[in-house]
Amino acid sequence: MVRNKRVPHIRGTVEEAVRLARRWGADEVLARRAGILHDCTKYWELEPHLEVCDKYGVELDELERKAVKLLHSKSGACIAREVFGEPEEVFQAIFWHTTGKADMTLLEKILYIADYMEPCRKFDGVDYMRKLAYTDLDKAMLLGVNMTIEDMRERGVPIHANTLGAYNWLVEHGVTLEE
């Protein structure tokens, strides 16, 4: 299901998700399972993603129908639930780990952030995110969502409405990146 080069990222995401779950009082077993399966369909071609989403009743917007990078979270969540029997919490965490959304659960935030900052990730700001993730999870979320939005704008790529929704929700609930 995944390529060998992806294994270190998956392991890193699992380890980070478990550490974050322990820090924030979430279910470590569910965090581990979500981390293991979060990229299980990452390397599929477009058509299998669409088929799985259609089979399991996942409604896709126009942007998702064209973007494999967005689709892997939706199809991966379906495989986690329907093939591996994972519970709804794991399904939802995997489902939202790419775009984020407004009003995310603790497990959803943990997987989103663990995937973003696992030890193999190297980019400007990742060390600050790693610090924030253990002191203020919502600030870490805002940083990640903000970095995604900036990256998409710089590359001229459409920003998914759910990513903007995550950003707006956090800001509307008083989360800032100010010290």
Short names for language-model regions:
Residues 150-179:
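Charged phosphate-binding loop/patch that engages nucleotide di/tri-phosphates or the phosphate backbone
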